């Protein structure tokens, strides 16, 4: 399955969930927000959220700075 993750093309197995894709981007437990095709998905929904070929996934990681 072909996805666009943070603006880059990514190939994932058919049936991959949003949680699977997030784990390929970060192992952070906190400070992560995710959207599919512009719609924010709550963390509780990541394991059940099935992706479709062509979906655009944005994974945002909060960072502190000074």
Please name every model-derived segment.
Residues 1-65:
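Ubiquitin-like/PB1-type beta-grasp interaction modules and other compact soluble beta-rich domains
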């Amino acid at each position: 399955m072909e996805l666009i993750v943070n603006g880059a093309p990514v190939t994932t197995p058919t049936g991959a969930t949003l949680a699977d894709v997030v784990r390929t981007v970060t192992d952070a437990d906190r400070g992560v927000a995710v959207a599919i095709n512009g719609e924010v998905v709550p963390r509780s929904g990541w394991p059940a959220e099935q992706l479709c070929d062509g979906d655009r996934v944005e994974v945002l990681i909060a960072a502190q700075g000074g």
